[in-house]
Swiss-Prot record:
UniProt note: domains: Avian ovomucoid consists of three homologous, tandem Kazal family inhibitory domains.
Protein name per Swiss-Prot or TrEMBL: Ovomucoid
A Pfam family hit: Kazal_1
Domain Kazal-like: 6-56
Organism whose genome encodes this protein: Francolinus pondicerianus
Entry-linked SMART domains: KAZAL
Length: 56
């Protein structure tokens, strides 16, 4: 299975939209969209990765 990844180079961003495009993080937490996920990735210093697209 190919590794799934998201480009978070443009983050963090101060404001995320409420758009529902869920992603599942390696912490087994569902993030509402790429912005929320990428902000969390930046805060985790890169330890958080994408598990898969969609809810956990």
């Amino acid at each position: 299975l190919p590794a799934v990844s998201v480009d978070c180079s443009e983050y963090p961003k101060p404001d995320c939209t409420t758009e529902e495009r869920p992603l599942c993080g390696s912490d087994n937490k569902t993030y509402g969209n790429k912005c929320n996920f990428c902000n969390a990735v930046v805060e985790s210093n890169g330890t958080l990765t994408l598990s898969h697209f969609g809810k956990c």
